[in-house]
Regions:
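Active-/binding-site microenvironments in catalytic and ligand-binding cores
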Residues: 1-162
Length: 162
């Protein structure tokens, strides 16, 4: 896929659509299409939007040992659905892939990244303050540090409420 320094900046900013999943996704459980079904995420509604999945995970686990061990994660079917719907980006308040505890990622350990990034759909992970966007229309801006041939980078993410 496209590296951070090659990705058009427009992919990192645009209209957002927040999906409030608090209380609907448990620790160590995937966000599945069944979980998303009640939210009317038809392709024509989410095309070219930044989909923001809000589970409340960062608020309860950030800075703890649990943050990357017990996190909810994205099911492969959801990543494939978002790719097919041609979303602009996927933003979450957790880590999208479930990794083996206490080990750095190995080849093949990050299926969501391998599905989404080759389609030039950025993943924006571990967002905070999403409670301020519940029920509101907004634009999201999450511009990553430009790293030559990088496949990930820290970003300053901000939203403009409309």
């Amino acid at each position: 896929g496209t590296t951070i320094d090659e990705m058009p900046l427009e992919r990192y900013m645009g209209p957002g659509l927040l999906v409030d999943l608090r209380g609907k996704v448990l620790d160590n459980e995937p966000v599945t299409l069944d979980v998303l079904k009640p939210f009317d995420l038809k392709p024509e509604r989410i095309r070219d939007k930044i989909i923001v999945l809000y589970t409340g995970w960062v608020e309860q686990a950030f800075g703890t040992e649990r943050a990357y061990v017990d996190n909810p994660y994205m099911a492969i079917e959801v990543a494939e659905y978002f790719v097919g719907a041609k979303v602009r980006a996927i933003a979450v308040d957790f880590t999208v892939d479930k990794l083996p505890p206490g080990q750095p990622p190995q080849d093949g350990d990050c299926p969501i990244h391998r599905i989404v990034l080759p389609e030039n759909i950025p993943l924006i992970e571990n967002l905070t303050n999403l409670d301020k966007l519940v029920g509101r229309e907004f634009e999201l801006f999450a511009l990553p540090i430009k790293i030559h041939q990088g496949d990930g980078a820290a970003a300053r993410a901000v939203a403009r409420v409309l």
